[in-house]
């Protein structure tokens, strides 16, 4: 019985064949459940209209198992529209109550990904959600005037005879003028230069090394973005550890700064990679074979086979994850707006600046089936050829596994320490030399416990990533010093107990998750974000069906930048928002 329970949980987690027992109904808009993810306002004052808006796509995805991609010609904002900030709005409606499967979606312009998102759970009366994202940093692609540029939305799903729901998706872009009002909660710091560049991306004649100094901060807009994506322009589907996706790129020799931005999501057997016990445990206990790779995954990026950066992804819990009742109507961190990850390639420009093709390879260490990954290479151009030298040293890594188990009870601990330090020298045509040193420390700790004959699963995980960038001139004087610190703790417990009657169990669940990020310049914090989630609840489960569920979800969000602060606190009880307070008081 107990072993069965564990298998049940593993099945719940790994096969995702959860079906809802709700009925088919198509109800009016007013009754539709409105889902949302906590974030700070992207527009300071909702009364201030955008300078202009463009509706890019209206499409109804019907059978998304055969037709996952929808592509139209991209419509840029009118050239007369004055703007400094672009906000992408993705709205979706689902009219069916049956599909409990989470679907992942992405939005691309000219194969450059702008948003990775996932679907909300359907409810009896249908559901509705809207995602807004500041996409200003993609300005070079947003302003493209080439009328054959593609605009694509992909919605990937499992579909079968029982899942007849349709997704209606509308995507728009709203453009706001920075100068028209104070923009207190901009997610972009110091981007005035970026704004100037916005409108004339191909004429960079006036740019010299002066710009190289002032423009370093991460969120200034790149002059060019090169997609590192699948053949058809979309995500790479990575099936296993040896599945290496390669793209050839040849970059402009005027490049003085490059950042690779990765979009990553895990699905199928890999959706709950952080809750995976090692092979030895699953084998000895005769559990579902091949599904016990342990809880370490890392996305590796190489240039011509040389490792240049890695990402240990932050778990994103989809809307039917762990306990579906948790995520109604407030979803988990990143469910609607997946984080993307930056790898600074500036110190590695010496590997790329020779007018030749270079191979950028992406793979998932210990990865199984499947991961959806792609990348955007953001490139900043100077006015003349840049010479670059790299002192290449591969990142170092230490991994420690500590496994101990007897029968179904056990403790599995993994600790990974990854550190890298790269120094690159770039010299502009004018002879100025700038040295960029990027050091990064990644720390991953995953402690997984199976107790009480495997009926109690406890996870305690922490991911920490600290990046330092130091820029110096030819005489060794500091020009800039940036530091980014991110911490992502996650605690999950799942306790399964038999209920009266055959095959029925109660499953008690908790999820405590945090996202904490800060960005500082010369030790002054320019931007900080703190998002806490605390959910507790239980479900009554029969086989693979959830019969009923109850939940409490508390979330706190705090954001601060050079212009102001924003905080919001939301409490949800059994799917009803019982408290929702926000203010703009700064907490020291
Ligand atoms: C959802 O809407 C589509 C199109 O309007 C309709 O064909 C379909 O029957 C609806 N599905 C349900 C479950 O109501
Ligand atoms: C939802 O719509 C269906 C038919 O469209 C209707 O029969 C049903 O009563 C509605 N449900 C509720 C709870 O109003
Ligand atoms: C989407 O629908 C709206 C309202 O019907 C329409 O004004 C708009 O042109 C449509 N957009 C596209 C891209 O078809
Ligand atoms: C969706 O496509 C699949 C695969 O072609 C097919 O088996 C299924 O019947 C289709 N479902 C609907 C509702 O059309
Ligand atoms: C898939 O969608 C495209 C429009 O994006 C449509 O032209 C095509 O007929 C669809 N194919 C199938 C098999 O439904
Ligand atoms: C999309 O646009 C159409 C036409 O304007 C509208 O009828 C529909 O309600 C919109 N859907 C969503 C999800 O906003
Ligand atoms: C669906 O709509 C009906 C009618 O407004 C309402 O009574 C019912 O509670 C709604 N169901 C859900 C799950 O929100
Ligand atoms: C695209 O632009 C070219 C040149 O400006 C023009 O000839 C062509 O008709 C345009 N195509 C579309 C679909 O607007
Ligand atoms: C659809 O639902 C029926 C009844 O619950 C079930 O017997 C059948 O296996 C399901 N089909 C699929 C493809 O899941
Ligand atoms: C890994 O996945 C690729 C792509 O699906 C496949 O061709 C290859 O056979 C797989 N390798 C292993 C060892 O499973
Ligand atoms: C990349 O370039 C290499 C050598 O230049 C070539 O052999 C390879 O086929 C190219 N790969 C792709 C995917 O274009
Ligand atoms: C989470 O919330 C529960 C009550 O719902 C509380 O007992 C617990 O201490 C909270 N945990 C954290 C880490 O805040």
Q: Regions from the language model: what does each represent?
A:
Residues 4-7, 213, 221, 582:
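Intrinsic disorder/low-complexity detector
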Residues 6-9, 195, 223, 227, ...:
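A generic signature of intrinsically disordered, low-complexity regions enriched in glycine/proline
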Residues 159-258, 385-419:
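Flexible, low-complexity coil/linker segments
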Residues 19-58, 63-70, 76-79, 91-210, ...:
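Beta-strand-rich ligand-recognition modules
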Residues 78-89, 251-259, 267-270:
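Extended extracellular/luminal ectodomain segments enriched in beta-structured repeat modules
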Residues 412-434, 438-440, 450, 459:
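C-terminal beta-rich recognition modules with glycine/proline-rich loops and embedded aromatic residues
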Residues 2-21:
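Cleavable N-terminal signal peptides of Sec/SRP-targeted secreted and luminal proteins
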Residues 11, 25, 246-262, 304:
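Charged/polar interaction segments and conserved charged motifs
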């Amino acid at each position: 019985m107990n072993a069965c329970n564990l298998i049940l949980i593993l099945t719940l987690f790994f096969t995702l064949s959860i079906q809802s027992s709700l009925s088919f109904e198509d109800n009016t808009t007013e009754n539709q459940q409105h889902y949302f993810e906590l974030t700070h306002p992207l527009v300071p004052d909702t009364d201030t209209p955008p300078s202009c808006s463009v509706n890019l796509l209206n499409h109804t995805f019907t059978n998304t198992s055969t037709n996952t991609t929808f592509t139209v010609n991209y419509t840029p904002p009118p050239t007369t529209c004055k703007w400094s900030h672009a906000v992408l709005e993705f709205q979706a409606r689902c009219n069916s109550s049956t599909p409990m499967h989470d679907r992942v979606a992405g939005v691309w312009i000219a194969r450059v990904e702008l948003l990775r998102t996932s679907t909300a759970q359907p409810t009896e009366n249908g559901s509705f959600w809207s995602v807004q994202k500041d996409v200003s940093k993609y300005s070079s692609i947003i302003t493209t005037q080439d009328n054959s540029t593609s605009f694509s939305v992909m919605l990937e799903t499992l579909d079968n005879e029982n899942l007849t729901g349709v997704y209606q998706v509308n995507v728009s872009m709203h453009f706001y003028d920075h100068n028209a009002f104070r923009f207190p909660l901009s997610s972009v710091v110091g981007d005035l230069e970026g704004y100037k560049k916005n409108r004339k991306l191909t004429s960079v004649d006036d740019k010299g090394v002066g710009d190289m100094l002032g423009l370093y901060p991460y969120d200034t807009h790149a002059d060019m973005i090169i997609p590192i994506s699948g053949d058809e322009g979309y995500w790479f589907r990575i099936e296993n550890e040896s599945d290496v996706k390669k793209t050839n790129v040849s970059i402009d020799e005027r490049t003085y700064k490059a950042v690779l931005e990765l979009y990553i999501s895990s699905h199928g057997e890999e959706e709950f990679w952080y809750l995976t016990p090692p092979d030895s445990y699953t084998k000895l206990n005769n559990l579902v074979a091949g599904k016990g790779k342990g809880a370490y995954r890392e996305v590796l990026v190489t240039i011509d086979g040389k490792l240049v950066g890695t990402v240990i992804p932050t778990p994103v819990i989809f809307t039917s994850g762990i306990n579906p009742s948790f995520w109604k109507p407030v979803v988990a961190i990143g469910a609607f707006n997946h984080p993307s990850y930056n790898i600074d390639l500036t110190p590695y420009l010496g590997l790329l600046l020779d007018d030749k093709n270079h191979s950028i390879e992406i793979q998932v260490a210990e990865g199984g089936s499947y991961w959806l990954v792609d990348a955007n290479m953001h490139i900043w151009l100077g006015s003349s050829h840049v010479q670059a030298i790299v002192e290449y040293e591969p990142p170092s890594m230490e991994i420690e596994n500590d496994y101990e188990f007897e029968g179904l009870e056990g403790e599995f601990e993994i600790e990974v320490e990854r550190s890298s330090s790269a120094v690159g020298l770039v010299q502009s045509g004018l002879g100025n030399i700038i040295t960029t040193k990027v050091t990064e420390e990644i720390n991953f700790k995953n402690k997984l416990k199976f107790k009480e004959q495997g009926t109690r699963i406890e996870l305690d995980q922490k991911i920490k990533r600290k990046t330092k960038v130091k820029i110096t001139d030819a005489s060794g004087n500091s020009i800039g010093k940036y530091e980014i610190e991110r911490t992502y703790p996650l605690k999950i417990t799942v306790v399964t107990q038999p209920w009266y009657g055959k095959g029925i169990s109660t499953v008690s669940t908790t999820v405590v998750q945090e996202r904490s990020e800060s960005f500082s310049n010369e030790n002054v914090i320019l931007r900080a974000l703190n998002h806490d989630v605390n959910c507790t609840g239980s479900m009554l489960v029969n086989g693979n069906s959830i019969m009923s569920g109850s939940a409490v979800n508390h979330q706190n969000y705090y954001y601060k930048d050079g212009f102001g602060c924003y905080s919001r606190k939301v409490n949800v009880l059994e799917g009803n928002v019982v408290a929702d307070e926000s203010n703009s008081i700064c907490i020291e």
